Amino acid sequence: MRIGHGYDVHRFAEGDFITLGGVRIAHGFGLLAHSDGDVLLHALSDALLGAAALGDIGKHFPDTDPQFKGADSRVLLRHVLKQIHGKGWKVGNVDATIVAQAPKMAPHIDAMRALIAEDLLVELDQVNVKATTTEKLGFTGREEGIAVHAVALLLRA
């Protein structure tokens, strides 16, 4: 069994929605990124890659590569899963914490969990997503961006 941790941050930029966990959420800003900016799926991908000792998403999907410009992070997550399966691992469970002052995440968490479970080929009860604020402290508290911490447990397939 292996455990991996992932962390990602994206700052807010011009736009009217963000994508988190594959879910499009209306917001007064977008997220600045080379891909679609799905900070949740990026942190999960890093946790999974880390657990399998496969590096990080920057190694697999560099932001200097034009083929990943605007990339759908769900496609990237499914690619990560193939890499993990190729090393003889399967997902035991994943757990993520979204750190954001806004927008409110609670109405979207069930949909995020469902899409992540679908992409990782696991049951819904193997995926947890939660959200918190920093009580208006730090860059997330000032609504300058969003951060996500993620943990993944891999089991031998």
Curated annotation (Swiss-Prot):
Superkingdom of origin: Bacteria
E.C. no: 4.6.1.12
GO BP: isopentenyl diphosphate biosynthetic process, methylerythritol 4-phosphate pathway; terpenoid biosynthetic process
One Pfam family named in its UniProt record: YgbB
Primary enzyme class: lyase
InterPro entries tied to this protein: MECDP_synthase (IPR003526), MECDP_synthase_CS (IPR020555), MECDP_synthase_sf (IPR036571)
Keyword Lyase assigned: yes
Names of required cofactors: a divalent metal cation
PANTHER family reported in the protein's UniProt record: 2-C-METHYL-D-ERYTHRITOL 2,4-CYCLODIPHOSPHATE SYNTHASE, CHLOROPLASTIC
Family: Belongs to the IspF family.
Descriptive protein name: 2-C-methyl-D-erythritol 2,4-cyclodiphosphate synthase
Gene that this sequence comes from: ispF
